[in-house]
């Protein structure tokens, strides 16, 4: 094996997702160990002190559950067990041990967030998951996220926490995905089998040739190998997010991260985050309904990059749910001028249209926020697309 990974400067960031694999939380005899996690926790603490946000995606629950079952002398009773159910039982048994390991490394409360694939497929649950994580970050709490293995359906799992981390990065609009593993990064070939294998510092495009460099073998305690990590990086790249794969066992990793540097493989996204989001909003199917807004709100959307507030809404057409993509038309204009993800369903919006944001709770008894459509979830339509995008005429 020739060469070493070069030290790289991290791109500017405010929010990152840091994924830690089972192998970094496992010591002798397969028991949980905080030896490597302690260094990564120092980076999280230093980031919080600097006003930055780190969301942890941590494996280790199944590994911890296996240890508890073995050392506790737990023996199954009569009847035939099921492999997937056994895995779920291990996750349930080990989840508290895994979160306790992390809590012992911080002087402030952590929050455990368990997600299933269905949480991100269902738009309302997707928005609720995002809102929960955003609220935790607003209070300075570090979310520790894992797949809810205990209730996940076999055919609807993320497969491994590499993929979960990529989904979470897209969910919360992370600036960067950091994947801590037990190898230094991607090599041109298997470094254990080929002495000519060279470290790959940068991947500009995840071509079949690049994917072929990765072996699919997982570590003893994990489920995702290098192939899985590149597939996760591919998902993050589609959302405009770069991924860096690095060695979490490196004794200098905390100091490097705190100084804004790393040694490893950086997988570049061909898109900016804004470009990826805009492209999706422009081409996602819109619901059979829409929102009519006044001239002032139309000017604010077109010129100021503002959120759409209920005070600017004059009417609602059709039926749509919270989390749907809806088209937005200005008064006296037949075609939509914008589209975005609505925070309120049509029936809710009819009750709050025209009111100030502070009155939403009074009218509904609850609130999903001050905006009907947040500016991060909204795109104005280029003139050439307005006729194409219009799925319905918004009359109200």
Predicted regions: what is each one?
Residues 2-396:
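C-terminal catalytic "cap/lid" subdomain
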């Amino acid at each position: 094996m020739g060469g070493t990974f070069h030290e790289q400067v991290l791109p500017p960031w405010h929010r990152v997702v840091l994924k830690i694999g089972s192998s970094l939380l496992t010591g002798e005899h397969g028991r949980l160990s905080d030896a490597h996690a302690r260094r990564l926790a120092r980076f999280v603490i230093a980031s919080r002190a600097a006003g930055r946000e780190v969301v942890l995606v941590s494996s280790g629950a199944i590994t911890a559950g296996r240890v508890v079952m073995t050392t506790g002398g737990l023996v199954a009773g009569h009847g035939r067990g099921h492999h997937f159910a056994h895995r779920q039982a291990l996750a349930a048994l080990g989840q508290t041990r895994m979160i306790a390991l992390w809590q012992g490394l911080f002087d402030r409360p952590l929050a455990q967030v368990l997600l299933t694939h269905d949480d991100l497929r269902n738009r309302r649950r997707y928005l609720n998951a995002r809102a929960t994580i955003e609220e935790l970050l607003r209070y300075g709490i570090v979310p520790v996220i894992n797949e809810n293995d205990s209730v996940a359906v076999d055919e609807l799992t993320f497969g491994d926490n590499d993929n979960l981390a990529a989904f979470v990065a897209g969910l919360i609009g992370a600036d960067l995905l950091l994947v801590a593993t037990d190898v230094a990064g991607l090599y041109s070939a298997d470094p254990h089998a080929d002495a000519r294998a060279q470290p790959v510092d940068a991947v500009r495009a995840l071509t079949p040739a690049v994917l072929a460099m990765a072996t699919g073998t997982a570590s003893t305690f994990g489920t995702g190998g290098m192939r899985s990590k590149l597939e996760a990086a591919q998902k993050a790249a589609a959302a405009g997010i770069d991924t860096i794969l690095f060695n979490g066992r490196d004794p200098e990793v905390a100091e490097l991260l705190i100084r804004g540097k790393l040694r490893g493989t950086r997988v570049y996204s061909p898109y900016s985050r804004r470009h990826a989001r805009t492209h999706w909003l422009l081409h996602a199917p819109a619901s059979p309904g829409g929102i009519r807004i006044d001239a002032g709100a139309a000017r604010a959307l077109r010129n100021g990059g503002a959120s759409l507030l209920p005070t600017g809404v004059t009417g609602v057409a059709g039926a749509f749910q919270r989390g749907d993509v809806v088209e937005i038309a200005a008064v006296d204009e037949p075609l939509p001028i914008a589209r975005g993800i609505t925070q309120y369903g049509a029936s809710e919006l009819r009750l709050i249209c025209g009111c100030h944001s502070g009155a939403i709770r009074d009218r509904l008894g609850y609130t999903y926020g001050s905006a009907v459509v947040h500016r991060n979830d909204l795109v104005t339509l280029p003139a050439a697309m307005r006729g194409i995008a219009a799925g319905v005429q918004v009359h109200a």
